[in-house]
A protein has these predicted regions:
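Mixed-charge, glycine-accented linear interaction segment located at domain edges/termini
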Residues: 137-190
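Oligomerization/assembly interface segments of phage tail-like spikes and tubes
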Residues: 60-85, 156-171
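Polar/acidic, low-complexity leader/linker segments enriched in S/T/G and N/D
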Residues: 1-45, 190
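Exposed beta-sheet edge/beta-hairpin loop segments within beta-rich domains
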Residues: 64-66, 106-111, 127-130, 148-160
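Beta-strand elements of well-folded, non-transmembrane domains
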Residues: 77-81, 122-128, 140-145, 167-171, ...
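Beta-rich interaction/scaffold domains
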Residues: 191-227
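Short helix-loop boundary/capping segments
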Residues: 93-142
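Charged, amphipathic alpha-helical segments
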Residues: 2-4, 80-110, 191-206
Length: 227
């Protein structure tokens, strides 16, 4: 049976991931870093906007012109991902110490305060009786309203975190946004080809004597992937 595309349900958001954009040129398709999960997704709202022009004459409307000029989106989560903040806001995560003395810090400084470009993809499972799942993909985004989160005391409810961004077309192919329906459920794809690897934070212990066992506490390694 063919998928029914006339009555798409919008229920059961299951996954939202973001991937930092590495490159976007007029000669090649964009490349992205490995996806980061925005855990605890509550909602993913996509809002295309139109520029409208109306031609008047003889005391009446003679014509109208409309064109999609921007696509805005808002994501709300029940928990905060430091790795997600690093992708959408910039900044840097650093680790220090080990075991009980371990400390993890996300920091935004004046030098890294420009939000990077990223891709965002959301997946929901209840899309229709003949549809396995549905995905929304925005290929080149930048935050327009940074994450806003509230921490309540024990008498209140759990806080949440939300941010708003704007999507724009990629340079070579003009990919902007896609709504993808799958006959069978598919997870958000994670690129399988590792193209590079870098050490973001060295291990706590870097000097050894002959015969000592390596200790990797504190080591943070980041890989770049290609579709």
């Amino acid at each position: 049976m063919a998928m029914d595309i006339t009555a798409l349900r919008l229920m059961e958001l299951k996954d939202v991931k973001v991937s930092r954009m590495i490159s976007d040129s007029a000669d090649a398709e964009p490349t992205y870093d490995n996806p980061v999960d925005l855990a605890g997704a509550l909602s993913f709202q996509v809002s295309p906007e139109l520029e409208n022009k109306i031609l008047y004459g003889d005391s009446t409307i003679m014509d109208s012109y409309s064109r999609t000029t921007s696509i805005n989106f808002t994501v709300t989560n029940s928990v905060v991902s430091l790795a997600g903040l690093e992708v959408i806001m910039g900044g840097q995560i650093t680790r220090a110490g080990a075991k009980e003395a371990e400390t993890v810090i996300y920091e935004l400084t004046a030098k890294n305060a420009t939000p990077p470009y990223f891709k965002i993809e959301g997946k929901w499972d209840y899309a229709g009786e003949t549809i396995g799942d549905a995905h929304i993909v925005l290929y080149k985004c930048r935050v327009s309203e940074p994450p806003d989160f509230t921490v309540n005391d024990s008498s209140g409810d759990f806080g949440d975190c939300s941010f708003t961004g704007t999507a724009m077309p990629t340079r070579k192919s003009g990919h902007w946004w896609q709504l993808i329906l799958n006959k069978e459920e598919k997870e958000i794809e994670i690129p399988s080809e590792l193209t590079s690897i870098s050490v973001k934070t060295p291990p706590t212990k870097v000097t050894y004597s002959t015969g000592e066992t390596l200790e990797l506490d504190g080591l943070v390694v980041e890989g770049a992937y290609e579709d």
